[in-house]
């Protein structure tokens, strides 16, 4: 249902009755995982900027409702830099390997802070850089679409979250995703690895990063 590099629904520790917003919902997988966790009194809103993915997600709603017995998930067309939800209306924002694709990541974090209720929290899984990639990789369109060339450094992610006014920031770098993609000889990862300096590997540059924080 879409690319993922972590498990933000588990990171978020969702509770019954909460309102959840998924940034870049794709085919809706994380929304459908979140739905039963928040239950009939909760609500899950998935936002995606592509009509094709929105149609796919909405097409999956019937199976979700039949399987779960719940009607608590909806999908909206919109950009994650300009979220189609009111201020202070969301308990939990989640996102799975999407923010790296945004051309204005600082604005995305501002939007996260805007839509969260006071005390609300964010749980994001994304790819991040331990150090800058070579220019040839950064200019590679396939590497951009593959969620690598657009990734920020861990320090840049931290700065964006804090600058947005979020607090209680916790970040955990996990090498397992990149190690798995490398061991599976993923074609994109092989291509990028070949462009790295001698002796360097993908895990020297890229990690899956879990980010959790709150709005004060």
Q: What are these language model-derived features?
A:
Residues 150-165:
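Short alpha-helix
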